[in-house]
């Protein structure tokens, strides 16, 4: 996968600039992805019970995934805290996202609709040529790059992204127990996207107060 540039990601998000519930849902999903590095199905599967305070820090608690390492706690970035709290206040059958609540598949995936919408928006914003490797998972790739550039220890990046790191189970268990939500929150706060924050008027008071002009 290839990470989006800030400009490219803003162009994709601006495809969802209308005021419809569907556009708002996609913007919210994408912002959570950009400020956490979570997988698209992890985000779509979030319920109100997965957003909780742990040791005084508002976090996403991811309880299931492909591997044992995927189960983890990811602090909520201050810039999307109002957005996340508003989603938690108005759930859809317990889920943060409406289209996840109405998607039931044998494989348990809740993100089918969101994946399709994101792919269409990317093609509309950036075209098809040369963008094949830029998908929703690229947000996760970008988060890993940003954390690495900020010289965050590899085992901490692995904890935040739910990667398996280290040669032994003992190493991972120790790391998980040693990293407090307060420590992890400091790393999450390093994730910043100046062009996107300016283009979408994202701030700590209001995350979806968009400018009317693209």
Regions found by a protein language model. Give the residues of each.
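Basic, Lys/Arg- and aromatic-enriched nucleic-acid-binding interface segment
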Residues: 1-40, 140
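Conserved tyrosine-mediated DNA breakage-rejoining catalytic core shared by Y-recombinases
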Residues: 8, 36, 45-85
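Catalytic-site neighborhood detector that most strongly recognizes the C-terminal catalytic loop/helix
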Residues: 3, 66-68, 103, 161-197
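Acidic, low-complexity interaction regions
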Residues: 91, 112-113, 154, 179-214
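Short, basic (Lys/Arg/His-rich) helix/loop patches that form interaction surfaces
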Residues: 16-23, 36, 74, 90-95, ...
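Short, polar N-cap/turn motifs at the start of nucleic acid-interacting alpha helices
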Residues: 51-55, 152-175, 195-208
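A short, glycine-centered helix-capping/turn motif at helix boundaries
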Residues: 32-46, 150-153
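Active-site/catalytic core of tyrosine-dependent DNA strand-transfer enzymes
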Residues: 9, 77-131, 213-214
């Amino acid at each position: 996968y290839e990470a989006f540039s800030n400009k490219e990601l803003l162009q994709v998000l601006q495809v969802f600039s209308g005021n419809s519930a569907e556009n708002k849902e996609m913007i919210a999903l994408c912002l959570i992805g950009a400020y956490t590095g979570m997988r698209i199905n992890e985000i779509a599967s979030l319920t109100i019970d997965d957003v909780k305070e742990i040791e005084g820090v508002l976090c996403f608690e991811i309880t299931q995934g492909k591997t044992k390492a995927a189960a983890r706690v990811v602090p909520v970035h201050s810039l999307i805290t109002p957005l996340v709290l508003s989603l938690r206040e108005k759930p859809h059958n317990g889920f943060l996202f409406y289209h996840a609540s109405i998607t039931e598949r044998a494989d348990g995936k809740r993100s089918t609709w969101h994946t399709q919408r994101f792919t269409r928006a990317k093609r509309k914003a950036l075209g098809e040529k040369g963008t094949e490797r830029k998908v929703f998972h690229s947000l996760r790739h970008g988060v890993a790059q940003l954390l690495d550039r900020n010289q965050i220890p590899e085992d901490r990046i692995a904890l935040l992204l739910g990667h398996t790191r280290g040669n032994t189970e003992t190493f991972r268990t120790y790391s998980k127990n040693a990293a407090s939500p307060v420590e992890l929150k400091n790393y999450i706060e390093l994730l910043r996207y100046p062009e996107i924050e300016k283009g979408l008027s994202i701030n700590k008071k209001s995350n979806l107060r968009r400018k009317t002009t693209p």
